[in-house]
Protein backbone atom coordinates (compact mmCIF):
# COMPACT_ATOMS: atom_id res chain seq x y z
CA UNK A 1 0.00 0.00 0.00
CA UNK A 2 1.34 3.41 -0.94
CA UNK A 3 0.91 6.47 1.23
CA UNK A 4 -1.79 7.73 -1.14
CA UNK A 5 -3.90 4.59 -0.73
CA UNK A 6 -6.40 4.42 2.09
CA UNK A 7 -6.55 1.16 4.04
CA UNK A 8 -9.62 -0.86 3.09
CA UNK A 9 -11.44 -0.16 6.38
CA UNK A 10 -11.34 3.57 5.61
CA UNK A 11 -12.01 3.24 1.87
CA UNK A 12 -14.99 0.87 2.06
CA UNK A 13 -18.22 0.61 3.97
CA UNK A 14 -18.61 -2.58 5.97
CA UNK A 15 -21.15 -3.87 3.46
CA UNK A 16 -18.60 -3.50 0.62
CA UNK A 17 -15.82 -5.54 2.19
CA UNK A 18 -14.70 -8.91 0.93
CA UNK A 19 -15.05 -11.89 3.24
CA UNK A 20 -11.29 -11.79 3.97
CA UNK A 21 -11.41 -8.07 4.78
CA UNK A 22 -14.47 -8.59 6.98
CA UNK A 23 -12.85 -11.42 8.93
CA UNK A 24 -9.60 -9.45 9.37
CA UNK A 25 -11.50 -6.74 11.26
CA UNK A 26 -11.83 -9.06 14.26
CA UNK A 27 -8.97 -8.16 16.60
CA UNK A 28 -9.30 -11.35 18.65
CA UNK A 29 -10.19 -9.59 21.90
CA UNK A 30 -12.90 -12.26 22.51
CA UNK A 31 -15.13 -9.86 24.44
CA UNK A 32 -18.01 -11.03 22.27
CA UNK A 33 -17.40 -14.54 23.68
CA UNK A 34 -18.24 -13.43 27.22
CA UNK A 35 -21.65 -14.17 28.72
CA UNK A 36 -23.75 -11.01 28.75
CA UNK A 37 -26.79 -10.09 30.82
CA UNK A 38 -29.50 -7.71 29.67
CA UNK A 39 -31.40 -5.60 32.18
CA UNK A 40 -35.06 -6.36 31.55
CA UNK A 41 -36.15 -2.82 32.44
CA UNK A 42 -33.51 -0.70 30.71
CA UNK A 43 -32.18 -3.04 28.02
CA UNK A 44 -28.67 -2.20 29.23
CA UNK A 45 -26.07 -4.91 28.65
CA UNK A 46 -23.68 -6.04 31.32
CA UNK A 47 -20.71 -8.29 30.70
CA UNK A 48 -19.56 -11.13 32.92
CA UNK A 49 -16.11 -12.65 33.11
CA UNK A 50 -17.50 -16.03 32.00
CA UNK A 51 -16.53 -17.17 28.50
CA UNK A 52 -17.94 -19.61 25.99
CA UNK A 53 -16.64 -23.16 26.25
CA UNK A 54 -15.28 -22.96 22.69
CA UNK A 55 -12.93 -20.07 23.42
CA UNK A 56 -9.26 -21.00 23.18
CA UNK A 57 -7.74 -19.55 26.37
CA UNK A 58 -4.34 -18.93 24.80
CA UNK A 59 -5.24 -17.46 21.40
CA UNK A 60 -8.57 -15.88 22.41
CA UNK A 61 -10.05 -17.29 19.22
CA UNK A 62 -12.85 -19.79 18.77
CA UNK A 63 -11.58 -23.36 18.87
CA UNK A 64 -14.26 -24.43 16.35
CA UNK A 65 -15.03 -21.27 14.40
CA UNK A 66 -16.49 -23.06 11.36
CA UNK A 67 -19.04 -24.95 13.46
CA UNK A 68 -19.61 -22.46 16.27
CA UNK A 69 -23.21 -21.65 15.39
CA UNK A 70 -24.20 -25.31 15.43
CA UNK A 71 -22.34 -26.07 18.66
CA UNK A 72 -23.36 -22.87 20.46
CA UNK A 73 -26.72 -21.74 19.04
CA UNK A 74 -26.60 -18.27 20.66
CA UNK A 75 -23.07 -17.59 19.41
CA UNK A 76 -22.39 -14.18 17.91
CA UNK A 77 -22.44 -14.45 14.13
CA UNK A 78 -21.93 -10.91 12.95
CA UNK A 79 -22.55 -10.20 9.26
CA UNK A 80 -23.07 -7.08 7.16
CA UNK A 81 -26.79 -7.92 7.26
CA UNK A 82 -27.20 -7.68 11.05
CA UNK A 83 -25.19 -4.53 11.77
CA UNK A 84 -28.27 -2.72 13.06
CA UNK A 85 -28.01 -4.80 16.24
CA UNK A 86 -24.33 -4.06 16.83
CA UNK A 87 -24.93 -2.21 20.11
CA UNK A 88 -24.46 -5.51 21.96
CA UNK A 89 -20.84 -5.64 20.79
CA UNK A 90 -18.25 -3.97 23.05
CA UNK A 91 -17.35 -0.31 22.39
CA UNK A 92 -13.86 -1.38 21.26
CA UNK A 93 -15.18 -3.78 18.58
CA UNK A 94 -13.84 -2.86 15.13
CA UNK A 95 -17.17 -3.60 13.47
CA UNK A 96 -18.97 -1.32 15.89
CA UNK A 97 -16.34 1.42 15.65
CA UNK A 98 -16.49 1.46 11.85
CA UNK A 99 -20.30 1.32 11.84
CA UNK A 100 -20.26 4.38 14.14
CA UNK A 101 -17.92 6.23 11.75
CA UNK A 102 -14.85 5.89 13.97
CA UNK A 103 -11.39 4.62 13.06
CA UNK A 104 -9.56 1.57 14.35
CA UNK A 105 -7.47 2.12 17.50
CA UNK A 106 -3.67 1.98 17.53
CA UNK A 107 -3.59 -1.51 19.03
CA UNK A 108 -5.76 -3.13 16.36
CA UNK A 109 -3.65 -5.68 14.42
CA UNK A 110 -4.49 -4.01 11.09
CA UNK A 111 -3.06 -0.73 12.40
CA UNK A 112 -0.24 -1.96 14.64
CA UNK A 113 0.79 -4.91 12.49
CA UNK A 114 0.99 -6.99 15.68
CA UNK A 115 -1.65 -9.44 16.86
CA UNK A 116 -0.20 -9.21 20.40
CA UNK A 117 -0.92 -5.46 20.59
CA UNK A 118 -4.53 -6.21 21.58
CA UNK A 119 -3.34 -8.15 24.60
CA UNK A 120 -0.56 -5.71 25.49
CA UNK A 121 -3.05 -2.81 25.41
CA UNK A 122 -5.26 -4.65 27.91
CA UNK A 123 -8.11 -4.94 25.43
CA UNK A 124 -8.25 -8.75 25.37
CA UNK A 125 -10.03 -11.21 27.68
CA UNK A 126 -6.78 -13.18 27.91
CA UNK A 127 -6.21 -14.31 31.50
CA UNK A 128 -9.34 -12.51 32.74
CA UNK A 129 -12.14 -15.06 32.46
CA UNK A 130 -13.55 -18.39 33.59
CA UNK A 131 -15.11 -20.94 31.27
CA UNK A 132 -18.82 -21.71 31.58
CA UNK A 133 -18.09 -25.15 33.03
CA UNK A 134 -15.84 -23.60 35.73
CA UNK A 135 -18.27 -20.91 36.84
CA UNK A 136 -21.36 -20.95 39.00
CA UNK A 137 -23.92 -20.15 36.31
CA UNK A 138 -26.53 -19.53 39.02
CA UNK A 139 -24.53 -16.48 40.20
CA UNK A 140 -24.10 -14.59 36.93
CA UNK A 141 -24.85 -11.26 38.59
CA UNK A 142 -21.89 -11.87 40.90
CA UNK A 143 -19.64 -12.22 37.85
CA UNK A 144 -20.48 -8.85 36.25
CA UNK A 145 -17.39 -6.86 35.23
CA UNK A 146 -16.96 -3.43 33.67
CA UNK A 147 -13.61 -3.82 31.88
CA UNK A 148 -15.08 -5.15 28.60
CA UNK A 149 -16.97 -1.88 28.23
CA UNK A 150 -13.89 0.31 28.35
CA UNK A 151 -13.74 2.39 25.17
CA UNK A 152 -10.67 2.16 22.95
CA UNK A 153 -7.95 4.71 23.52
Curated annotation (Swiss-Prot):
InterPro entries: Puta_zinc/iron-chelating_dom (IPR005358), UCP006173 (IPR008228). Pfam families: CxxCxxCC. Belongs to the UPF0260 family. This is UPF0260 protein Plav_0898.
Amino acid sequence: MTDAEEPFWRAKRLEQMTRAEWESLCDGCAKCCLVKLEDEDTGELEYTDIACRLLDAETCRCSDYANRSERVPDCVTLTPKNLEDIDWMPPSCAYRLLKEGKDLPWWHPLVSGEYEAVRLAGMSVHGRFLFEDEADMEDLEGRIVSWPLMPPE
